[in-house]
Amino acid sequence: TGLKTHCKICLVVRKDKDGIRRYLHMGTGNYNDSTARFYTDIGMFTCREEYGVDASSLFNVLTGYSTPPEYNKFIVAPHGMRPFFEAMIIQETENAKLGLPAKITAKVNSLVDPEIISLLYDASNAGVKIDLIVRGICCLVPGVHEFSENIRVISIVGQLLEHSRI
């Protein structure tokens, strides 16, 4: 399929007295029993139908069994992620223009996409407070008067992979 996959999902499908039930765990880190003694990654365990259906659909796409569907809850690259992020940035920009609270906090591996960067600059100029945590390369220039003054970037460039952990 030519896709780069970086997802932490475990899906158990079980037939019980009420029919098919899907149990799903999604997390930020690897399923590694030796490191589990030292820290806990952030995860979600659910049997809510809409998440289970999305997980089943995702596995079907990754194995080549089907084409990407319209997901109920999942935001999946490469098709769903860009429109989702664009819509969220535009929504916060509109909130700021209406005098409503407007803030963006995002943690990303890198920020090099010109269109997303342009939307973030527009949001900053509208008054949106933006905090970005960028692990790798960042092409956005923060803190420039009357251009990106509402944007703050924290860089966590380094040789160690970093996850949210408790």
Q: Where do the model's predicted regions map?
A:
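PLD/PLD-like phosphodiesterase catalytic module centered on the HKD motif
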Residues: 1-22, 27, 35, 50, ...
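Non-catalytic alpha-helical coupling and interface elements of nucleotide-dependent molecular machines
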Residues: 14-15, 29-31, 60-67
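Segments surrounding the PLD/"HKD" phosphodiesterase catalytic module and close analogs
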Residues: 25-58
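Charged, low-complexity surface segments at secondary-structure and domain boundaries
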Residues: 38-45, 69-77
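Alpha-helix boundary/interfacial micro-motifs
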Residues: 44-46, 65, 144
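Short, compositionally biased "basic patch" segments
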Residues: 48-69, 83-84
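Gly-rich Lys/Arg/Thr-decorated short loops/hinges at beta-loop-alpha junctions or inter-strand turns
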Residues: 65-74, 99-101
